Amino acid sequence: GTIHTDLINNNIIDDPFYRLNEHDVQWIDKKEWRYKTKLDVKVEALNQQNIFLEFEGLDTYSSIYLNDSCLLKTDNMFRSYSIDVKNHLKLGENILEILFDSPIKKGLERRDNLSYNIPISANDLAEIGQVEGNKRVSVFNRKAGYHFGWDWGPRLVTSGIWKPVILKSWNNFKISDVYIQQKLQNNMAVINAAVELSFDKS
């Protein structure tokens, strides 16, 4: 989910797509947010040679903590991240925290540190967003441009865990990717499958 959808689901904000409600939620992108959960790790998983935490989508500026150790900082919502957590996990309860920095504050830092001006889309509705000095910062963030406003949607500069987080463990090798291609020929379908394997060095 995202900060906005989680706040809606917990009845903290009203639907920002209704009427002019977007104007009432512009404070959200100026704050820092924290997600926290517990991972119960069994001995079977802990005994595996490889244990990785895979983040398929984090939007955008995050710090990932496992049992109070910062393992990674991110700044791009368009890519995935994989972290070796074998030496950071313990048997039983583990605490995973993801802290999200304000994309507006980060964007302002990057904008103000630049010694020259660059073109910025008029779709960046900084005025509605009540951004300091109406400064447009969309091009300084590796996140979806439409979050900053567009003619077809509201300005909702959100953050959050927008794709799955997966804890994976394995020995010796794993299936990294599977690609299946189908070709139809008359009354017959021919299916080709390519399977990519990753092996440990040993």
Regions found by a protein language model. Give the residues of each.
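Beta-rich accessory regions
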Residues: 44-45, 184-185, 199-201
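Predominantly extracellular/luminal regions of secreted and cell-surface proteins
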Residues: 1-11, 158
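Beta-strand-rich binding/interaction modules
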Residues: 64-66, 188-202
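Short, solvent-exposed loop/linker segments at the N-terminal edge
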Residues: 181-189
